[in-house]
Amino acid sequence: MDALGGLDLTVGAGEFVAVVGANGSGKSTLARLLGGLERPAGASFAVACGCDLLSEEGRMAARREVGVLFQNPENQLVAECVEDDVAFGLENLGWAPKAIRARVDEMLARFWLADLSRREPHLLSGGQKQRTALAGVLAVPRRVLVLDEPTAMLDPAGRAEVLDAVHGLRAAGLAVVYVTQEMDEVVGADRVVALEAGSAVYAGGVAGLFGDVALVQRLGLGLPAAGELALELATAGRPLTPLPLSLDELVAALGGER
């Protein structure tokens, strides 16, 4: 049985698309396919670079164009200090030392790591480790970034660090595919794709997904925290329409009742 089938996903430059679904729905398989880390079992499967992932050449091309960040940053940290880890991919590609230094400094600044440049990875917090891994992935210029539940092992502060960093990449024109089971992380997406048994059962706006209560329940997704609070208020006789999905929307909706 194929893990994915009949899935058509288009993500534009600067666009943030969230991918959600229950365990086993195909989210991680999609992330690995997009990054050229697995070979599709069936028909042609192409990514932003136009490469066909059925061929080894196509998968190698995808790995150059598509950066992938996974749950556990320690699996992607390979050097003895932060700046050496960020430089690792560039050194393997044969970049000139001056170009490497400039690019590493750029990445350290972008991901708020300059003060930690000589720090050993095992001394970093979870959020700092994930930002270091992200800087290393993107030190090599990419067109697409795929993140597979990158905050799953982080505390709330670490999650906020990583989300702020990822959302900041949109302004740079990077296409972002963000796999998550945290519904609060979906709220800031441009679009959301919901998977079930390897197929997309919803693709569209965030409000449209969470407005379909039956589908959300069937997929076992839950709602963002603000939406859950709004449902409790509705049960208590204070319905809010449309359903607020963020804290700001909830506060605005409650203020509008006065």
Task: Set out the residue ranges of the language-model regions.
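The feature captures the beta-strand-to-loop junction immediately N-terminal to the Walker
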Residues: 20-22
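Conserved ABC ATPase "signature" region
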Residues: 98-116
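Conserved ABC ATPase signature
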Residues: 120-124, 128
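Conserved ABC ATPase "signature" C-loop
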Residues: 198-199
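ABC ATPase C-loop
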Residues: 137-138
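Helix-to-loop junction immediately C-terminal to a conserved catalytic motif
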Residues: 35
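Catalytic Walker B motif of ABC-type/P-loop ATPase nucleotide-binding domains
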Residues: 145-148
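ABC ATPase NBD Q-loop/coupling interface
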Residues: 44-61
